[in-house]
Amino acid sequence: MSKKTTPSSAPLDNTPYDVTEQVGHLLRKAYQRHTAIFQQQACDPQLTSIQFVTLCALRDHGPSSQAELIKATAVDQATIRGIVERLKARELVQLSPDPGDRRKVIVELTESGAALLDAMIPCARQISELSMGSLNAGERVAILYLLRKMIDSDENAG
């Protein structure tokens, strides 16, 4: 678990608290913007951004348990279960019992899922481009670096 900043250790700041200037609020707005762009630009209008991330994780890591997908996608257990069910209903993934532990289910990309993923890659590149909006090359590198740094500091603290 990461160390929490307590009020006594937080820097004193007497300026009024403006939620619209806080990192969580700004990240949420940026994510909402990205999600809207994804839905408008996706080659498959039925595919959500997190379903796309899940398909990418399966492509990158191969057949995976739901626990492995949770780690690869940063999605909680209840959400990943629903994502997998929706992808299965579209025959983009298939499920099979884990040979090492029959209680576990292994999720695997189907040929249809791999084909959709291949078709989506050019769209995904365009979505990323649009999501970055008017940021110049240096700003794009900086924002990705800073986001990774925020994530890495949280993972290293645990």
From Swiss-Prot:
GO molecular function, one term: DNA binding
Location of the DNA-binding region in this protein: 66-89
Keyword Lyase: no
HTH marR-type domain residues: 20-152
Pfam families: MarR_2
GO biological process: catabolic process; response to stress
Induction info: Expressed both in the presence and in the absence of the 6-hydroxynicotinate (6HNA) inducer.
Pathway it works in: Cofactor degradation; nicotinate degradation [regulation]
Observed effect of gene inactivation: Delayed growth when using nicotinate as sole carbon and energy source, growth is faster in the presence of 6HNA when compared with that of the wild-type strain.
UniProt cross-references to PROSITE patterns, sorted A to Z: HTH_MARR_2
Keywords: Aromatic hydrocarbons catabolism, DNA-binding, Repressor, Transcription, Transcription regulation
Protein name, UniProt field: HTH-type transcriptional repressor NicR
Protein's organism: Pseudomonas putida (strain ATCC 47054 / DSM 6125 / CFBP 8728 / NCIMB 11950 / KT2440)
Source taxonomy: Bacteria, Pseudomonadati, Pseudomonadota, Gammaproteobacteria, Pseudomonadales
